[in-house]
From Swiss-Prot:
Ranges annotated as biased composition (Acidic residues): 338-347
Segment forming the signal sequence: none
Polar residues biased stretches: 10-23
Compositionally biased tracts (Basic and acidic residues): 36-54
PANTHER family named among the record's database cross-references: CARBON CATABOLITE REPRESSOR PROTEIN 4 (PTHR12121), NOCTURNIN (PTHR12121:SF45)
Name of the encoding gene: NGL3
Root EC class: hydrolase
Keywords in alphabetical order: Exonuclease, Hydrolase, Nuclease, Phosphoprotein
Stretches the record annotates as Disordered: 1-75, 334-369
Protein name, UniProt field: Probable RNA exonuclease NGL3
Gene3D superfamilies associated with the record: Endonuclease/exonuclease/phosphatase
Example GO BP: polyadenylation-dependent RNA catabolic process
Sites bearing Phosphoserine, chain numbering: 62
Amino acid sequence: MDSQVEGKISPSQKESSSTSGLVSPSEDGPAHQKIHRDQLSVDQIKKIREERAQKRQVRRNSLISQGKDPDFPTPDLQFIERPFLPINHDNSKGLTPATIQVTQDSLDVKIMTYNTLAQTLIRRDFFPESGPALKWHKRSKVLVHELKKYRPDVVSLQEVDYNELNFWQENFHKLGFDVIFKRHEGKTHGLLVAWNNKKFQLDNDWMLDYDNILAGNVISARTRTKNIALIISLYFKGITDSSSRGIIVANTHLFWHPFGVFERLRQSYLVLQKIQEIKACSKYNGWHSLLMGDFNTEPEEPPYLAITKRPLILKGPIRAMVECSLAYRYSKKRNGEESDQDDEECDEKSRGEGHSDQPQNPKPESFTATKEEKALVNQLVALHNSLHVKGVSLYGIGYGKVHPENANGSHGEPGLSNWANTWCGLLDYIFYIEGDHNQDTRQKEPLNAFEGNNNVKIIGYLRMPCAQEMPKHSQPFEGEYASDHISLMCQIRLFFGGEKVHSLK
């Protein structure tokens, strides 16, 4: 991975410029005489730096004494802090996350996913109410403030600007994290995974370019999306025989287009198939696996169902949505025939994209599909049903136990993770990937069964806001949230070897 970004100033350059042409007392002249750096002796430069460091420390100590974080002292660098909500697994026995036994063969891990909003995608007309909160020099500090406050152990970021990669690397390293970043060569932003380097060590990494992979060696991408998945494997440190124990972490950002349901369904198959392939290697036998990111999908839509249900059955309006998306024709620009620009939501405002007979509603109640469109949908559904892995949404399976008024429908997911100017809802998820055991999983699995089957215990969740709690204006906004997305974080306890979760109850 290329960690260098053009146009950045090195620490030595910053240090050099910080003393150049500044006011400083002189031994031979009056105080506050402006002396060029070239005229200062080494001892004078050293003295100036020491005085400045002392002043900075005095300011920091003053802020700390006031109960403020000295790195984020002003109101514009604050955000709405959300509490951690622990699960009480068994009220009758008085067990809480603090009293559930932690053994040498278990590890607590806080998992976060966060779409940080790429600065290169921001257009003022898309964020008319955000004002100065859109400026990177402020927003970036708030994003780091969030990470410092919530302290995840593994974090997957989407929409990370390549030209700000040094910023992310430096700040994650200050927090004790190692990072890996990948992007499609046609995009200005990409995916980043960071991990606590006291708990984990990188083992391997894979990148999937969805556009260049045939699903089932047959079904190609219908348009150029430039979407990818980044998958890594991490060894656990401090666990007995750690060489055989770790986690597989997949970070992805699926196609955004309103008529992109079929493509998102195809991309979700590709990332699940790759995780299944990795897990089939003897080296990764028994490793826990997670898939997270921005799926641009709501819980009632086909891609979410394809990740979480076996067998996948599409019928009625759900199937109509997929077939309708197949009938949509993308522009020549998006397909790469006329432009090499980074096509995003901000670049395609028209629904018709030049065709007068385009579908107008991406979620029709019914749709008259062609024979070929029906066959293609059937083929993709069959591919999903051929998989031996599926996802369990960590929020979906247990969030209702800690925040029931914000756990919605049969899926149990919170109401939102995106609060934008034109749309609000849930798009982001953290899935635990488990074997499907050839069982019918269309009905939601009980939490205790999930934990026992997978040697995992859910400890708690970062609280998600309800729609009623959100301001009328969109995000980001000063003092509220630094992105139009809201981060999700779940703490889980992973068990290894012969230790079983149910034996601890």
